Amino acid sequence: MKNEFTLGVEEEYMVVDPVTRELTSHDQKIVEAAQKIHKDQVKAEMHQAVVEVGTGICKNTEQARLEISQLRYTVSQLAGEQGLRIGAAGTHPFSHWEKQLITEHPRYSEIVNELQEAARSNLIFGLHVHVGFQSRELAIHIANQVRYFLPHVFALSTNSPFWENRNTGYKSFRTKIFDKFPRTGIPDIFNSIEDYDNYVKLLIKTNSIDNAKKIWWDIRVHPFFETIEFRICDCPMLIDETMAFTALFQCLCAKLYKLRLQNMKFISYSRALINENKWRAARYGIDGNLIDFGKEMEVNCRNLILELLDFIDDVVDELGCRNDINYVLKILENGTGADRQLAVYEQSGNFETVVDYITSQTLIGAKQ
C-alpha cells in the first residue's frame, strides 16, 4: 500500500497587550470571532492568553503554508480589533503564569484538578505537525525509528530562552516547563501497534487516563487521526520556520518508509540515549554538540543537521518541498528563534523590545 504523507499543522500563539507587552487573558473573544471565519480551525487553550490554530488535511507543504498564513493573518486582525497582538514563541519573556486566567471548560478543570501547579504554570506555546499514515502498524514502526532525529529538528526550533523576566540559559526552556507533566518526553520503543494499544488500555483500566490524548509525548501515533504527531518543537516565530520543520518531519517519514520498502530500516535507539541529545538541544540549540550513537562520539549539531539533509535528499523533490527544506540552511546561518531573541535582548537590554520583535516576526508572510 502506498502511503500518502498528508500534513496537518497546529500552532499556539500568545496574546499580548501592545502597551505593557504582558500576556493578556482575553476571555476567548478572539477565538469566538475567528471561528466564524475558520470554524474549528481556531480553538481555545487551557490558558486564556493562548490561541491555538490548525490547518485542515493538507496534501503538501505549499497548501499548509497557505493555511497557516491565513490563520496567522485572521487571528492577528481579530486580536487587533480587541486592542491586542499575537506572538509566536515557546514562552513569553517576562509575564508570570500566576496572573493568567484558566479557560472555563470541564476538560481544563479536570487537568488542573489532577496536575495542580504543573498545569497552572504550563503557560507555553508549541508547534505540532501531523504526518499522515494510513496503517497504524506502519506508523508505530516509523515512529520508533524517527525518534532519533527529534533532537536535531528540536534544536533548530528552539525559541524560548526567557521565562518570567530571566534568561534561563536554555535555548528552549519551554520543554523544561512541560517536563512537569506526566507522560511527556521521548517515548519508549513499541514492538507493534498491539503493544502500544495494550499500554493505553492498561492506563485507562487503572484510571491513569481516560483517553490516549492525555499521553503528551514528543511524538505519538495519534489516537484518533491516521497520523504520526510530532510535538517536540517550540512554536516558531516565522512561517518559513514552521514550514521548514514541517517539511523535515514529512521527509523523514517518507525516507524511513522508502527504506522499509527496500527491506531496510534505521536503528531504533533507546529513550535514554535520545533523551541525552534532547537535553543538549534544549540547552544549546544548534550551537552545541549532539551524540552520534553509531560512531559513539560527539558531533557538532550543525554538522549533524547537514547530514540529516543529505539523508532525506532523495525524497525532498518527490514531496515538492525543496524550498522549505532549503530554509534550514538559513536557520543555520541566521540562528534559531532563541538566538535572535537573545541578540535583541543583548542589544536593547529590555524584554519589551523582545516582545515587539516576536510579534512583528510572527506576521511576516501572514496574508488573507
Residue ranges and their predicted role:
Residues H105-G126:
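Acidic, His- and aromatic-enriched active-site or binding-groove loops in soluble protein domains
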Residues W97-S109, G169-T184, N277-K278:
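Short, low-order "capping/linker" segments at domain edges
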Residues G83-Q100, E164-T168:
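Short, glycine/charge-rich beta-strand/loop segments that flank catalytic centers
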Residues M1-Q82, I111, F178-Q368:
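C-terminal accessory/tail domains of diverse enzymes
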Residues S76-G90, F154-N159:
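Acidic/histidine-enriched active-site and ligand-binding environments that engage anionic O-linkages
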Residues R120-V146:
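Internal, well-ordered domain-core segments that constitute the primary functional module
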Residues S135, A143-F190:
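An exposed, glycine/acidic-rich loop-and-rim segment of catalytic or binding clefts
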Residues P18, L84, A89-F94, L127, ...:
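An acidic- and aromatic-residue-enriched active-site/binding cleft used to recognize and process polar
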